[in-house]
């Protein structure tokens, strides 16, 4: 291996290591326990990285698994997200749209959304009050022959609210 190749390889390894270390440092203080926002998250009034931000994503977890279902292989994407509403315009983050593929009449190729849960957490009299989203607030909209949107609005959202939602997309291979 010549010197130029060795330098490039070493540089790439160093960059990858530093990237992994920075990701590790960022996740050390992140609350990964969904359903239980911390007092610190509830009391937060601004984001130090972006003081004018209307909202801040406190945590987003994307998990991907491969499974055998209904006699075939599929990919299961599990998404969990927690957002703090900091300003009135941040309330728009409570309006969520999830796109997915739905081939009319061909269930073997269509994606499915399962396990949708959404919650708003507010402070009242020094206690955290949890408001669950009712399934009646979930709507589906067809965009074209193949594409759909699942839309919902998390209730009781105001400045200071922490919202959480989670769902799974099951996608056949």
Q: Predicted segments — roles?
A:
Residues 26-173:
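Beta-strand-rich, non-transmembrane domain signature
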């Amino acid at each position: 291996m010549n010197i130029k190749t060795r330098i490039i390889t070493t540089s790439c390894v160093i960059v990858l290591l530093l990237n992994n270390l920075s990701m590790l440092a960022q996740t050390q203080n992140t609350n990964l326990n969904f359903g239980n926002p911390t007092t610190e998250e509830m009391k937060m009034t601004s984001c130090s990285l972006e003081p004018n931000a209307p909202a801040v994503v406190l945590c987003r977890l994307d998990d991907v698994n491969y499974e055998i279902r209904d006699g075939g292989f599929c990919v299961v994407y599990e998404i969990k997200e927690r957002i703090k509403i900091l300003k009135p315009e941040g309330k728009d983050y409570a309006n969520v749209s999830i796109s997915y593929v739905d081939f009319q009449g061909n269930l073997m190729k269509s994606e499915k959304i399962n396990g949708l849960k959404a919650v708003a957490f507010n402070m009242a009299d020094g206690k955290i009050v949890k408001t669950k989203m009712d399934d009646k607030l979930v709507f589906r909209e067809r965009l074209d022959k193949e594409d759909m949107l699942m839309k919902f609005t998390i209730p009781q959202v105001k400045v200071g609210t922490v919202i959480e939602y989670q769902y799974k997309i099951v996608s056949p291979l």
